[in-house]
């Protein structure tokens, strides 16, 4: 539990940064960043992921889980793609298909479809100026998705900044379900993504009996816990294996307020290793005073459980933010919602 939660914490450090050829990125992409979409144009549940290695090398992956109703086995297709980084448009210079292409199947059509996604996303993103906000709408004609659509571009989404595509009926034909960043060359988070399955809530979740109240502190900030909690590190407290609370200081990423906000949101909404933040089930609220509130639902594939994480950033007059994160298994959170919400509200 602790390992899964700690992997969500982040560092505000740029390593190698890139941009898609011909695109002016407000937030430069970092090596290892990725995005996954649910493509609702397929008859079966289908996901498409795009990963950036550097400014000339990418990976695109298709995944469809087993469809028992239609008796369809799990399906996967991965392609490594190289591009001309100096081009003003998406100019593929090579590719390597990493998965077996079966004769007499629709594999060739699927490969062409993935090619089209890359070319089309690049061309449509190139039509936009710098995307420096969330959910920027652009009405375009897109035959691949049924004609006239609204593409929502978003600064917090890496690579092409495409968040959702909505058709003329108001239906999402394609939607971002998670973003993330690989932590090392050994990180299999991108290749291991298999969607957000329906998981059984932990049957052993029990109502928590509040213990003796105690106030804990870190770096001048306090939160009210009780004797059920154990301090693991200077700034970390655990409630058995069910919950983990962390306090920290988050530095300002940039003096440009808008860039700072978008960058922090991208980092705090990024999945890490085998823990995937479910975008459609998560929210972020940036207040006028600069405070930020995140309510995130994530799926941890290692434990096959959903996790609810509340994150609060309180802006400091001296610069930076005081940060609180409370992560709880979903079953425990639902049974003890008022207990955990009270803890979050006590952050001062």
Each predicted region: which residue ranges?
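Short, exposed beta-strand-loop hairpins at the edges of beta-sheets
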Residues: 152-177, 301-304, 314-316, 326-338
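Acidic, serine/threonine-rich low-complexity disordered tracts
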Residues: 20-89, 94, 98-209
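N-terminal targeting sequences that direct proteins away from the cytosol to non-cytosolic compartments
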Residues: 20-30, 34-36, 43, 194-244, ...
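Sec-dependent N-terminal signal peptides
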Residues: 4-15
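Extracytoplasmic/secreted proteins, especially bacterial periplasmic and envelope-associated proteins
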Residues: 84, 96, 224, 263-264, ...
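Short, exposed beta-strand/loop patches in secreted or surface proteins that constitute
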Residues: 24-27, 49-53, 119-128, 151-153, ...
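Conserved polar/disulfide-associated segments of primarily extracytoplasmic proteins
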Residues: 88, 95-120, 234-317, 321-325
């Amino acid at each position: 539990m602790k390992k899964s939660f700690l992997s969500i914490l982040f560092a505000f450090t740029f390593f190698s940064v890139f941009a898609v050829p011909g695109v002016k990125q407000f937030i430069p992409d970092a090596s290892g960043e990725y995005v996954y979409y649910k493509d609702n144009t397929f008859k079966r549940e289908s996901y498409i992921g795009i990963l950036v290695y550097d400014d000339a090398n990418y990976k695109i992956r298709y995944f469809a889980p087993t469809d028992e109703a239609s008796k369809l086995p799990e399906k996967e297709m991965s392609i490594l793609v190289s591009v001309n980084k100096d081009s003003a448009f998406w100019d593929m210079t090579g590719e390597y298909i990493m998965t077996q292409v079966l004769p007499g199947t629709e594999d060739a059509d699927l490969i062409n479809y993935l090619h089209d996604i890359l070319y089309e996303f690049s061309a449509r993103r190139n039509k936009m100026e710098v995307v420096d906000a969330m959910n920027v709408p652009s009405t375009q004609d897109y035959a691949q998705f049924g004609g006239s659509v609204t593409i929502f571009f978003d600064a917090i989404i890496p690579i092409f900044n495409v968040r959702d595509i909505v058709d003329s009926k108001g239906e999402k034909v394609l939607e971002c379900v998670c973003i993330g960043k690989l932590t090392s060359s050994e990180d299999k988070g991108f290749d291991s993504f298999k969607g957000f399955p329906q998981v059984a809530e932990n049957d052993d979740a029990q109502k928590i009996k509040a213990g003796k109240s105690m106030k804990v502190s870190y770096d001048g900030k306090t939160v009210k816990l009780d004797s059920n909690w154990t301090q693991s590190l200077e700034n970390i407290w655990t409630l058995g294996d069910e919950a983990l609370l962390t306090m920290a200081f988050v530095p300002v990423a940039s003096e440009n307020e808008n860039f700072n906000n978008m960058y922090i949101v991208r980092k705090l909404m990024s999945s890490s290793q085998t823990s995937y933040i479910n975008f459609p089930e998560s929210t972020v609220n940036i207040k006028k005073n600069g405070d930020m509130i995140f309510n995130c639902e994530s799926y941890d594939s290692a434990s096959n459980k959903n996790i609810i994480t509340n994150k609060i950033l309180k802006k400091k007059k001296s610069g930076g933010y005081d940060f609180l994160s409370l992560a709880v298994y979903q079953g425990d959170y639902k049974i003890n919602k008022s207990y955990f919400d009270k803890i979050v509200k006590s952050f001062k």
